[in-house]
């Protein structure tokens, strides 16, 4: 039997000295509660050690260019293969990265266009062909014996002027005749051309009669004409037509030259191909007037101009005062009071000079005569000239990304877009959905020579497109920017890229690849994972999805609890072996001993509804959607069907603009009816709760403020005069100044990875010695930050305010996180649950709309059960909950389902079904209904077995 991967003494993070042997060339799933230690074992131990050993095998010179991972806390690992990690945190933040560049399909497209494209004039649209001298000579001989020709070299094409200097130079060079505007002249004669008219001048190189033995002379004449005409020449048949030839890519009609089609001119990341206006980004930041003045009824004096609060002495308002005076208006007017001409000038700027005085920062007052700049160009200029990050960030809220006005989002120069394959340029190909590209390339009509060149390129493109389809990304376009992809989409793109590499004998480690996938797409993903395994690879998948766990060859269940209560192997083996272990929560859910029950009855709501009319943003097909208030609604549908567009971009942003006077971008919809029935809108997304390690769950929820207040009330703190600020690690006073309250110091190592060592002064405690001398129940402030939520609950049992917040964090499944855990180390799901807990801590007013996008991300079935209790409780209190979700355990307990589809991308964007889960199951063309029906039936069966038929 082949030796597996042997792990001995794994103690990384919360792991409890794990000893484990994993089989090779199998699909292995690590399961367990959130925070049980799955990622610690998979990524922080197995992958880290595999990567470290690989980098260590390289030379010291090579190592300095590679990030090296720290050695995990482990005795040893044997039998490791080269390891590749495909997680969700490695998403590109580069606006130049697209689906096409990440998957390398764009590189193959560039090669295809360089070798098998056809050129068309960007001005007149006529085909452009490049010909060699031999090809031109052969074409002329084919005109037939006794054909009389004039070989002409064009020296001026549609150019104004008398061209006297040009004609004189031609005389000096010994040329005898020219053709000007189709009239033949001798250069010895005086040629008069009108100065203000466009003229075309061609030099007569030779006059030839086609006959046997003429090829040598014809070749010399053609070469001379091409040289004089800069790659262009004309063969004029006497008493017949002109034949235009080009040795370059140049239009014979317009004279427009195109560059040689090489791969670099089709790259928007190369100056030879990138649109010069947007530098290949395809978009530019422009000031948005709707954000600058969201309410056009408010006067300028009361702050109508949001980016620039009213101050009569500033440069803007001195100008504006003079501008309004010209229209006999004052600062007490609003934008809507302006005449139409003034509105245009206010937005874009005027031509009339305004007289106004301005006192600068040195106290000097000067008189100025300037035209009003216009609020839109001024906002853009101030953003570009901002000298602090904070100012730039503030002004960025009033800018939106718009397609480049020159390339219209194509990213490339017009010359690059002149080349076509299958009558489409490379930008048009990139804008097609992956599902449409596959048949396009399969049915591509190429000439025989082009087929030979393109065969291998098309094979690679076909494979990569197929892999994208197999991981459920058929709705994406190659031009989609990588920064706009969700974590799950980005991970599956990297997965598709790895499949394309065809590597064998590799250890792949994946982090919840099923996130964001509809059950139908999940089936394709599982087939892909099995295909990678069958190639001869080992796959370790950290996953909560039941179908993935059931499909595994080997399951390792980590637990039994989270945090300090986890870190042990509760069960390992096949599905049947894990189901037999009573201590395994995963096994019990798989077996059916534990399950999430159906609600006793479905709510019908409070009689009111939110109605979205005419939603047509992105791929939405002008749909009307009703969302019942006072109910738990779930929006379902395949990846790319329009769920996030409908709920996040239209419902949340549109409702927020109505209720809170925010200035989100104007998504395409007609109206939202029923906004008056909602008091508050809360969007609980998966964006980080902070961008720095100083942010944590305790600071975000204000829990830390209460804890600092408690420490300041101790007798020792009172005696020393310490206020709550003394116990903050963000400000001077109580923090350790050696590490500025970080607790660690980074040491840069040239040949090794950067090393983070505990601060020598505070030894990682973050505070100075005097602050740490203050204790509450024997613990100092640093000790408290190192506690998990579960540990802190009994510690603060006598403080209701702190206890209530801690219990809320525990209820949302975050009992395992440390109070001081940096926000930068939290997953999107953890950040979302911190936000949910923060909202739950606030006083409930009822009539609140809660929006959550895939809240089950990273959650075990047991955690989902707890989360659903909280969400149902919110609805019971008179609120409305709208959730975007694929997890069928959540979908089955909804009061209402809005199912979008039927598929993703252009094939989605319609309401497939609406109603209760039972009603959705009856809709035959609903993919959600097809997968939901057996889940509801199984749950009913389990409820009947456990509780009898109610």
Where are these regions (language model features)?
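Conserved phosphate-binding elements of NTP-dependent enzyme cores
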Residues: 1-950
